[in-house]
A protein has these predicted regions:
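Alpha/beta enzyme core
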Residues: 1-104, 110-118
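Extended, intrinsically disordered, low-complexity segments
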Residues: 11-12, 107-148
Length: 148
């Protein structure tokens, strides 16, 4: 099904003379779509179908095993992308294994919202305004972040 979508998007973008970058995603690892012993082969097979359909890159969500990463990267015909995941080695090591892009995924907002929830609970419990000035950015720093 995804192949048909990729083909349609590629065909439409080509017809409109739009240089579109298509990053195909699979959740073989994230959702354990096949038994563990079959995941590498299934992932490689999906990559082959997606590249034939017109995908430019391949994102494998939930992939953290270095042996699997290296095997997949060496067998597919497009760049391999992974997301930050528990147990995943640092970006430099991933590059040596063949990974071309490391995404933060939902890690940054998940971490941020954990801190927000903890701060809100402490503030509601204590009513201490000092909490709002500890470890925070100034208004000027915030403005600078959002001024491009």
């Amino acid at each position: 099904m995804l192949e048909a979508k990729i083909e349609s998007v590629r065909r439409t973008s080509s017809n409109l003379d739009i240089d579109l970058f298509i990053n195909a995603r699979t959740d073989v690892y994230l959702r354990s779509l096949v038994p563990e012993r079959e995941r590498v082969e299934e992932t490689i097979n999906r990559a082959a179908r997606y590249v034939m359909a017109g995908a430019d890159c391949f994102f494998v969500a939930g992939l953290a095993d270095t042996n699997a990463i290296e095997e997949i990267a060496s067998e597919i015909e497009m760049p391999l992308n992974v997301a930050a995941w528990p147990g995943l080695p640092p970006a430099a090591d991933l590059g040596k294994l063949g990974v071309r892009r490391l995404s933060s995924g939902s890690g940054i907002p998940q971490t941020l919202w954990k801190h927000v929830a903890e701060l809100a609970k402490r503030f509601l419990k204590t009513g201490d305004s000092k909490l709002m000035s500890e470890n925070c950015m100034s208004h000027a720093q915030l403005q600078e972040l959002f001024s491009v």
